[in-house]
Amino acid sequence: PIGTTYREAIEATGGFDCADPALVLGGLMMGSMSLNLDEPIMKTSTGVVVLPQEHHFIQRKLRPAKAQAAIGKSACDQCRYCTEYCPRFLLGYDVQPHAVMRSLAFTGTGADYWNQLASLCCSCGLCTLYACPEELYPKEACDDSMAAMRKANQKCTGPTTVKPHPM
């Protein structure tokens, strides 16, 4: 019921199998992570996945944004899998997560151009959780680019017509 804490709800269904649980709220792909088991269930709460804090997925989610960018800056090999798997790219939108990852290696020069390549990202997480063979963070890089665009009050100026990928 609404207002019940996640801890109470999970204990009512059999409890935890691990000593240090972490919650993924809203699904693994687009959901958020919480370590607060006493957070109340709200009307908008959806799926809950309980994993131990030492689980690989949780460790990736706990990595600070600065570390994610540093890893992406040094390890992205520009394989383009993140772009080729992107559902928005396949629909014909000019979303290029691989190019946004490339921009991590640059200084602030040209940020307006690189940010545009992330502006139509739907943040589904497919690139980060499935497509990238290096286990990098293209979704998070796109999220950061979109946040920078919002902060600078920029709008997407890309093409207005789309042509679906012939796949």
PLM features: residue spans?
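Redox cofactor-anchoring modules in respiratory/redox and cofactor-processing assemblies
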Residues: 1-134, 139-167
